Amino acid sequence: MKLILLGAPGAGKGTQAAFICQKYGIPQISTGDMLRAAVKAGTPLGQQAKAVMDAGQLVSDDLIINLVKERIAQADCANGFLFDGFPRTIPQADAMKAAGVKLDYVLEIDVPFDAIIERMSGRRSHPASGRTYHVKFNPPKVEGQDDVTGEPLVQREDDKEETVKKRLDVYSSQTRPLVDYYRAWAEKEAAAAPKYRAISGLGSVEDITQRALAALAE
């Protein structure tokens, strides 16, 4: 099972990726983890990536694609792999296609932006313990206070509404076009292209997992 998981920030990709990887016995590969592992291992590509990052520059798509090819050739990818957060852009998708990286599925977890904003901006946390709450879905017993200590809860910078909206804007302009890219490719070249599937990311975690696994069994 070789697949790409697409979806906006806050759509629940990380949670579903864990279930899918467990079901199929495949690793979850993110470019960040892949880069860190290559740098740590000191491979020639890892050394190139380190030099670029140390200079404060972005790693080129060519180098990323070469790292991807190196990563998916490893033994733990014998049964496949799940790409999380890659490709991010059309040029990266084109480069992956040109490099002959074969995929079985592209699975999109679709959640309306207003639901994502509500989901993320309602999160509150107790920094000392790591306990998390949600003002609507999992509220503390006393508003704004941790259930155990009574200490004030905080909203992380990443969860503030304006931050969430900015991240969704970036997703809309850079990554959302990939949905159309893979959908169009699947319609045009059904035999060569990965199967494109979209599922709703609304509802319970269990419901979404069932939808995801059913889509990957089609």
Curated annotation (Swiss-Prot):
Location in or out of the cell: Cytoplasm
GO CC, alphabetical: cytoplasm
Name of a matching Pfam family: ADK_lid
GO molecular function (one): adenylate kinase activity
InterPro entries membership: Adenyl_kin_sub, Adenylat/UMP-CMP_kin, Adenylat_kinase_CS, Adenylate_kinase_lid-dom, P-loop_NTPase
Broad enzyme group: transferase
EC numbers on record: 2.7.4.3
Region (Disordered): 127-151
Renumbered residue ranges of the record's region NMP: 30-59
Assembly: Monomer.
Matching PANTHER family: NUCLEOTIDE KINASE
Family label: Belongs to the adenylate kinase family.
Protein name per the record: Adenylate kinase
Organism ancestry: Bacteria, Pseudomonadati, Pseudomonadota, Betaproteobacteria, Burkholderiales
